[in-house]
Amino acid sequence: MSEEAKPWSMARVITASSAGTAFEWYDFFIFGSLTPVIAKIFLAGLDPTSALIAALALFAVGFAFRPLGAIIFGAMGDRVGRKATFLTTVSLMGGATFAIGLLPTYATAGIIAPILLVFLRICQGTALGGEYGGAAIYVAEHAANNKRGEATGWIQSSASIGLLAALLVIVATRTALGEEAFNAWGWRIPFLASSILLVISLWMRIKLSESPTFAKLRDEGGTSKAPLREAFARRDSLKQVLIAFFAIMCAQGAVWYFTFFYLQVFLEKSLGLPAATKDMLLIAMTLVSAPLYVFFGWLSDRVGRKPVMLGGMLLALALYFPGSHLIASSVNPALVAAQAASPVVVVTDPATCTVQFDPTGTRRFESACDIAKSLLVARGISYAEATSPDGTTAIRVGSGTLAVPGGEALDDPGLKALKTATGDQLKTQLVTAGYPASADPEAVHYPTLLLVLFGFVVAATALYGPQAAALVEMFPTKIRYTAMSLPYHVGTGWVGGFLPVTSFAIVAITGDIYAGLWYAVGFTALSAVVTILFLKETRGKPLEEC
């Protein structure tokens, strides 16, 4: 059997493998985009805020179980084979996604509805843990040594296909049915439509043969009997796993998720850009990114994986703070001007302030200090903090002052009413001081905004494009599936997945809307240092020598 696929079959290998990865991202964006609807449908027994938090927790379940799936299906892929494993993962993933569209609602089934949803999310997350590694390895083990980066770059670009498919299906369904019908039953259609991707993906993958590299290893009796032990219990292979995580995946989780997720929150929540405008920017960024993954994969075949990925990290580090400030001044110049002319100061007793990190949504944040800070953070307003001489709390905006009462003695409805009333008073005071209620689309300087966003897209794709080839080339064939899957999903699921909530907590602690950038800066800088010191160049290296 040839070690390289013929050109016509290589196209089929790439297409079939990419379909499953596109499916992964389709599911990711569908569930994330429909979180508010899912909260109403499956968690109707909770109050709206708790329901939304619980729905976000359901979304996070997919991240939490990805490393488990990486272990299970990674070992399976190294023992049984690449083809059988990613047929299993795409079937489990597709079946679970389709089944969500058939679930009974809380109104008809009670508590059993969210229980079934949790089970299906666990199935999805576990399956996704084995999907990416299988697809990337399968393509890499078919590709010529001097074209491996370009070939696996197509796997990376499938994220764009999945995102666009999700956005188009949701928008088309909402437009055709109307908001009321969509919320009542139309939300099922995007999940049920996944069956089309599933059938196509299965049809293409069934026709594929086993990876030639793995088939040769299996025929020679060289497959691993205990891939988990060989990957993680042996010092040399464990060292490579750690380098893969710290040199590549920490940066990938930080840079990619910052670019395609955190920036969307920053634009809409912190800067007040209308959601429709933000969505159009996301679509534009996604379209631009699709060919860049392949380009940077191709470039890594010419100049090396290490310099291309390191270039992406360094570009991101150069852009994080100045780029974010440019985005702010381009999107909402009135906000930037108001913060300079009328800075906000929270005057309070620091002893009454708590760290506003609440991923479970169970804390009340009832002190006057916490109420003041949470109201400002929710509006994307930077603030300084000063000590109150008499222990009271007030928000000072320019020359105006708003007294903020505490809510320790109030029940939950009373506390909610207090926060709402104080928030309305704060809004009035901010407007009086020149703070805009939202960004004015007519005042946005789009050339600067698009240029900065393009810079972040280049950084993310330069890092992500060669990533699959680099990871594949770090490990021998007999443990490749196991060894590369775990660092990938810990990096994307945990480093990237926790980026929004951790960055928000940093903003709440410091009062600076830019302080959350330090999370991404820290992980990206760590990866850059580890890449320079420990990551070896593997461009063009035969997989048999890995």
Regions found by a protein language model. Name each.
Residues 79-91, 302-313:
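Cytoplasmic membrane-interface "Motif A"-like loop-to-helix N-cap segments
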Residues 109-129, 337-348, 443-462:
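Hydrophobic core of transmembrane alpha-helices in multi-pass small-molecule transporters
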Residues 44, 91-110, 315-334, 432-440:
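C-terminal ends and interior cores of transmembrane alpha-helices
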Residues 56-75, 94-96, 283-296:
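Central cavity-lining transmembrane alpha-helices of secondary-active solute carriers
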Residues 325-451:
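Low-complexity, proline/glycine-enriched hydrophobic segments characteristic of transmembrane helices
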Residues 31-32, 237-285, 323-324, 351-386, ...:
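Extracytoplasmic gate region of multi-pass secondary transporters
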Residues 150-174, 323, 485-499:
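Glycine-rich segments within core transmembrane alpha-helices of 12-TM secondary carriers
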